[in-house]
């Protein structure tokens, strides 16, 4: 069995780790960074960029640069939270045929699972380069408060990337694993996880290698991106007041504002004031306009205060569900880049009445936890038992549109639970089972996960037939539902797939696209490498010709010039094989030039030595070159 890797698929950044013996290790990417921006971009010529290269060109290519796609994963296009994002991102969010929110680039649509798969592929390649072996299995993390559709979409992303997802693990639980693995400590901890796009809080009990989640709560649309957007709105408003120009209508300016906002936010965690300076942000009839503004930490905190306060209620609910008070929490572990913000740390301290634990790297701890879980599944990590919970209640719609819970939130998973229902009308021969997830009393106010029909119920007065509905949640938090007529034994079951979501055919197509793209990317990379090598050879050959061309025969010089000309012509195209062939031809032709250069150098060195040694006589033997050649 090959290595199983742990991946933190984040909204803003992603990270990959692996067990190195008994120690989890974060793997650096090709750029030498321990985290990779979760950004995918498409260039003019169709080249796909992932991570840092995609982030670098975002300002000049805003409409083709997709960031924070995790906020769309498993969501419907008409979701109010998606509606909000549509006006804040420079790329296009489109409605898919199944009603899901997808993204559109140059007329081509991509599902959020597909875009996430490109990031996962990058993490897979990073691990393979480090391990020197193929990797095809992973543990991937998701926010604890992700619903079934979002978990399924994340699993689909893994499949598209060529990974078998052995386990979907909740981010706070992964962080707790990383925090508690080497500690003899026992007790109750709270994990406060404020990342790039989501907020989670989990209460866990740790002892003797058992990590038991007591409760979890959160908000899957609250994170660093919202803090950035709040600052972007403020900057745009201030600029409009001063200059009368709305920067929100300019996608290039909007992207520059976003980068500046993110940078300012990070700086204000360690300094009390920063300056935002964006020259030539836009122009009007009077000429170019510049944006220059000083921003204090106090002003930024005032702008985002309500966002920080929004994390308090989920913490209180999690404590209540766990049956604990804040004073009974032994330690609060901070996870996610946003927890570096002093205001966030202050709110956590006030809420739990103690200084939060800062001994873990908030950007890496989740990936480390995922790697530990991978080690558990592989058998490399012993004596660790993880007991997680389902974050939201599950149930079905019953008479009058009521939501009837079958599995309550914070139930330990995997779990299985059944309940018997009956018909609402006389002689009813079929029932439609509509499955929902959420905490509201009316089914319509919760998230519908899917529906199916149980047919062929024998005619009987209403209330007589007995229909047993069974919910089965696996260790990934993914739901299976079955309905059985107890009289006939007829059964119907589905693995929940939202009315949206990707079908198997969709996933297979995307897997094939990803494989085809991988081949295309390899070809493109080979072409770039070949071009770079060829360019370098042309440059060095032309330089050498200019300096030493007179030392070779005219025919040899002409042959080199022709080879240079042919290679330059080949460089106008993208045929890697043709470029390689012409490069080899030039390399062969220019060998005579190289010989002439070395001969001249040897003569110069000999003259230098002779000048140095004119006091001392030296004996030397002349070698007959022709004799040597014959005997060789």
UniProtKB/Swiss-Prot annotation:
GO molecular function: ATP binding; ATP-dependent protein folding chaperone; unfolded protein binding
Classification of source organism: Bacteria, Pseudomonadati, Pseudomonadota, Alphaproteobacteria, Hyphomicrobiales
Role: Acts as a chaperone.
Protein name: Chaperone protein DnaK
Residues with PTM Phosphothreonine: 198
Keywords attached to this entry: ATP-binding, Chaperone, Nucleotide-binding, Phosphoprotein, Stress response
Transmembrane segments annotated in the record for this chain: none
Pfam family, one: HSP70
Keyword Phosphoprotein found: yes
Region (Disordered): 524-557
Family recorded in the similarity comment: Belongs to the heat shock protein 70 family.
HAMAP family assigned: DnaK
Induction (free text): By stress conditions e.g. heat shock.
Native organism: Nitrobacter hamburgensis (strain DSM 10229 / NCIMB 13809 / X14)
């Amino acid at each position: 069995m090959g290595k199983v890797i742990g991946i933190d698929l984040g909204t803003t950044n992603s990270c990959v780790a692996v067990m190195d013996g008994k120690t989890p290790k974060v793997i650096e990417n090709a750029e030498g960074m321990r985290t990779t921006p979760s950004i995918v971009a498409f260039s003019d010529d169709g080249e796909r960029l992932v991570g840092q290269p995609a982030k670098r060109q975002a300002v000049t290519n805003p409409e083709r640069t997709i960031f924070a796609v995790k906020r769309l994963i498993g969501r419907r296009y008409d979701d109010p939270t998606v509606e909000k994002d549509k006006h804040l991102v420079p790329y296009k969010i489109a409605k898919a045929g199944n009603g899901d929110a997808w993204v559109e680039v140059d007329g081509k649509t991509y599902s959020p699972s597909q875009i996430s798969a490109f990031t996962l592929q990058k993490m897979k390649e990073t691990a393979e380069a480090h391990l020197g072996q193929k990797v095809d299995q992973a543990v991937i993390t998701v926010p604890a408060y992700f619903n079934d559709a979002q978990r399924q979409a994340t699993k689909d992303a893994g499949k598209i990337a060529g990974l078998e997802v052995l386990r979907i693990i909740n981010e706070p639980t992964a962080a707790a694993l990383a925090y508690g693995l080497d500690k003899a400590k026992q007790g109750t901890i709270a994990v406060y996880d404020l990342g790039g796009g989501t907020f989670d809080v989990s209460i866990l009990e740790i002892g003797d290698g058992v990590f038991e989640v007591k409760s979890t709560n959160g908000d899957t649309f609250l994170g660093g991106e919202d803090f950035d957007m709040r600052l972007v709105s403020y900057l745009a408003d201030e600029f409009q007041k001063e200059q009368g120009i709305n920067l929100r209508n300019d996608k290039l300016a909007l992207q520059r504002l976003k980068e500046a906002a993110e940078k300012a936010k990070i700086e204000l965690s360690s300094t009390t004031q920063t300056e935002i300076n964006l020259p030539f942000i836009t122009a009007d009839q009077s000429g170019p306009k510049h944006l220059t503004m000083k921003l204090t930490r106090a002003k930024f905190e005032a702008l985002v205060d309500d966002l920080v306060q929004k994390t308090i209620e989920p913490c209180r609910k999690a404590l209540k569900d766990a049956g604990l008070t804040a004073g009974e929490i032994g330690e609060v572990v901070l996870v996610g880049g946003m927890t570096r913000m002093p205001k966030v740390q202050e709110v956590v301290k006030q809420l739990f009445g103690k200084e939060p634990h800062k001994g873990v790297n908030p950007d890496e701890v989740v990936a480390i936890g995922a790697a530990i879980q991978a080690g558990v599944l592989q058998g490399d990590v012993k004596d660790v038992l993880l007991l997680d919970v389902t974050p939201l209640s599950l149930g079905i719609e019953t008479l009058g549109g009521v939501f009837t819970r079958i599995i309550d939130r914070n139930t330990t998973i995997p779990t299985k639970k059944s309940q018997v229902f009956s018909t609402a009308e006389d002689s009813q021969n079929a029932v439609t089972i509509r499955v929902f997830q959420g905490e509201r009393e009316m089914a319509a106010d919760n998230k519908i996960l899917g529906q199916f029909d149980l047919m062929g119920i024998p005619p009987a007065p209403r209330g007589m037939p007995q229909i047993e509905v069974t919910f089965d949640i696996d260790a990934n938090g993914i739901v299976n539902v079955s309905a059985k007529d107890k009289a006939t034994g007829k059964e119907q079951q589905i693995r929940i797939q939202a009315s949206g979501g990707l079908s198997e055919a969709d996933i297979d197509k995307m897997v094939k696209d990803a494989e085809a793209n991988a081949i295309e990317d390899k070809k493109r990379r080979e072409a770039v490498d070949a071009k770079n090598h060829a360019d370098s050879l042309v440059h060095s050959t032309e330089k050498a010709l200019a300096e030493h061309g007179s030392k070779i025969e005219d025919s040899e010089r002409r042959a080199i010039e022709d080879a240079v000309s042919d290679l330059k012509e080949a460089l106008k195209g993208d045929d890697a094989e043709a470029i390689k062939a012409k490069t080899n031809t030039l390399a062969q032709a220019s060998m005579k030039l190289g010989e002439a250069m070395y001969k001249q150098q040897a003569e110069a060195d000999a003259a230098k030595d002779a000048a140095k040694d004119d006091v001392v006589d030296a004996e030397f033997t002349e070698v007959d070159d022709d004799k040597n050649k014959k005997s060789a």
